[in-house]
Amino acid sequence: MHTPRALLIAICLLMAPAAAFAQDVGIVESAETINKGNFKIRVNPLLVFGKGAEDNTGGIAAMIGYGFTSRFDMEGGVAFYDGLTFVAANAEFWVLKEAPLDVSVAGGWHQRFTDQSDDYHGIDLTFLASGHVGKRLEIYGGLDLAFEGLFSDTDNFTKAHIVPGVEFKVNDAIDLVAEFGIAITDAARHYLTGGIAFYWK
């Protein structure tokens, strides 16, 4: 383990502010984009922790993506909770490669469908920094923003999380990922998720 790199990654994890598309499908990846010409499918269950007297809520998300270049990919998918469904899509650009960290920026959109309140959609913005602390292990920190209720009759609000996570490379075709979303706005909720990603060409 390289001490300077590990220290720099740890600082990024502590300093990264965030707001949350992560509460619907999660970030659940490092800053590296999908390899050019490759497909990816990811499945991850989520546990969202209620605030105060609120119940905890469980859900499951699935995303599929494609690497268009060595630095750019796109993903889309769904998340299902009890009485609530999210449909989401995003595009990610790998800004810095191993300098000494990997850094990416992603923008996206999501739509919420529910029988419990009004449907709405929002815009997502995610900043990621990650780095290898071993041959197969990466740690990452995310700034994940969701601007909710835009272009609708509902009140606008923003959900924000700090999102530290780990990604373990089983082999060239499989990654295991886990993260904890730390809510930093009143509208956000802490969450825990872990999942598996498969890659193929």
Please state what every model-predicted region is.
Residues G58-A61:
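Short, acidic/polar
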Residues M63-F80, F86-E92:
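Transmembrane beta-barrel domains of bacterial outer-membrane proteins
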Residues M1-A31:
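Cleavable N-terminal export/targeting peptides
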